[in-house]
């Protein structure tokens, strides 16, 4: 039963943290600035 081996949990935790870090990096670098730019442009358009 591989679920009882300790390195199985270490492997799962390390890949979970790696995936979380990659997801956080991609969101903060590429996806979220586009939304910020969109909201800022909407705000400028409504203030005109």
UniProtKB/Swiss-Prot annotation:
Pfam families: Fun_ATP-synt_8 (PF05933)
Cellular compartments annotated: Mitochondrion inner membrane
Alphabetic keyword roster: ATP synthesis, CF(0), Hydrogen ion transport, Ion transport, Membrane, Mitochondrion, Mitochondrion inner membrane, Transmembrane, Transmembrane helix, Transport
Keyword check for Ion transport: yes
Recorded GO MF terms: proton transmembrane transporter activity
TM regions (residue ranges): 7-27
Keyword Repeat attributed: no
Topology class, membrane: Single-pass membrane protein
A GO biological-process term: proton motive force-driven ATP synthesis
Protein origin, superkingdom: Eukaryota
Entry GO terms, CC: mitochondrial inner membrane; proton-transporting ATP synthase complex
Coiled coil: none
Function description: Mitochondrial membrane ATP synthase (F(1)F(0) ATP synthase or Complex V) produces ATP from ADP in the presence of a proton gradient across the membrane which is generated by electron transport complexes of the respiratory chain. F-type ATPases consist of two structural domains, F(1) - containing the extramembraneous catalytic core and F(0) - containing the membrane proton channel, linked together by a central stalk and a peripheral stalk. During catalysis, ATP synthesis in the catalytic domain of F(1) is coupled via a rotary mechanism of the central stalk subunits to proton translocation.
Similarity remark: Belongs to the ATPase protein 8 family.
UniProt-listed PANTHER family: ATP SYNTHASE PROTEIN 8
Quaternary structure and interacting proteins, as annotated: F-type ATPases have 2 components, CF(1) - the catalytic core - and CF(0) - the membrane proton channel. CF(1) has five subunits: alpha(3), beta(3), gamma(1), delta(1), epsilon(1). CF(0) has three main subunits: a, b and c.
Protein name as it appears in the record: ATP synthase protein 8
């Amino acid at each position: 039963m591989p679920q009882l081996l300790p390195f199985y949990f270490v492997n799962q935790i390390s890949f979970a943290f790696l995936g979380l870090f990659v997801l956080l990096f991609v969101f903060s670098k590429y996806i979220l600035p586009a939304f910020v730019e969109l909201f800022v442009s909407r705000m400028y358009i409504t203030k005109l």
